[in-house]
Amino acid sequence: GIAVETVTEDAHTSLRLHRRGYTSAYMRIPQAAGLATESLSAHIGQRIRWARGMVQIFRLDNPLFGKGLKLVQRVCYANAMLHFLSGIPRLIFLTAPLAFLLLHAYIIYAPALMIALFVLPHMIHASLTNSKIQGKYRHSFWSEIYETVLAWYIAPPTFVALINPHKGKFNVTAKGGLVEEEYVDWVISRPYIYLVLLNLVGVAVGIWRFMYGPENEILTVWVSIVWVFYNLIILGGAVAVSVESKQVRRSHRVEMSMPAAIAREDGHLFSCTVHDYSDGGLGIKINGDAQVLEGQNARLLLKRGQQEYAFPVRVARVNGSEVGLQLLPLTNQQHIDFVQCTFARADTWALWQDSFPEDKPMESLLDILKLGFRGYRHLAEFSPPSVKVVFRALTSLVAWIASFVPRRPERAAPTLSADPAMAQQ
């Protein structure tokens, strides 16, 4: 039966089935999809449950021991479980350079140049290797943001689960809610803000030590400051994630490209293409002129195999050839037919799977930089008035420093001579 000893019953049941000799097959065809969480707090709550459950399995039914699993299966299961123990190492990474800058403690007893010569090539090589292997599905550097957002919250439950694996209960993740206004979740972002302030103190002390400290430590101070700035960019991205965007759709839209037709009440028929749909409406593009009016009733014709179905709709908006349709009340049979024509199609999620652009590490790094600065801009935008004064002063200071950066003068456009003879010379 289903394993109930842990809060991640699906992974635990899968492990037990493999131990008993059952085999599983991976099908690279998306069969279904589920809603994501609407808020960062709900997302973190879901990941806390996942992290606790996987560590519980690691303690109660460790895949590295026991019988029934092949070596590859043991490694894969152990990797999936140990991944959720990244909270404490990530927090150490975000504060490690501060040990030297603030406390004068050497976490790595080696010259700064030697550390850079060993660490930088390894980081570049690891990033390029991951991009080559997983570039079609994952983008470089984004896991840094993901782990930073979760680190503070998954570290305590995973540590407790290692000590007492029976502690914890199953919590259902709420989905499908609405977000009326854009806002910053100050409660969730509080740990990131504390880490930002701590790293800013480290930068200030590092600059002071760079100017007035011993000469033999200048290079080490410089490397530590660069490390702190990298951490500040990652923390800025974590702050940007805590900004909740407005979510007013009650039904999630699914992208798709499907031929269809729309019939007006007077009998005129127009071919169109469905480019997105939900349980309450559709977005279509009419092939040609959109000869429908907003508020007009019509019938949408969809096909499944050789069978054709008609659904009553109302034109909600018209923007050129782009038309938004709202489904009118359907009978039970019509609703079943609509689901069969849309959500239940075998190729429903094919477009979603193939729509990801391939990873380009430098572009991903640039996106991370933009996200980090955007996080601090949102922090200033949504902060109390008394704090905004400080942010404005810092922004003015950064702009003043940036004004000293040399700029390449614009090249004057060449002037054409009016004399053809001179032009030939």
Regions found by a protein language model. Give the residues of each.
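Alpha-helix boundary/capping detector
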Residues: 43-44, 73-77, 167, 174-175, ...
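Residue-level signal for alpha-helical context at structural boundaries
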Residues: 58, 65-66, 159, 166-167, ...
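Membrane-embedded multi-pass helical conduit in multi-pass membrane proteins
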Residues: 83-168, 184-245
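Structured alpha-helical
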Residues: 183-425
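Single-residue recognition of alpha-helix boundary sites
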Residues: 20-21, 64, 101, 180, ...
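Non-transmembrane catalytic domains and loops of membrane-associated enzymes and transporters
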Residues: 1-155, 415-425
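Short membrane-interface loop/juxtamembrane segments of multi-pass integral membrane proteins
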Residues: 171-183
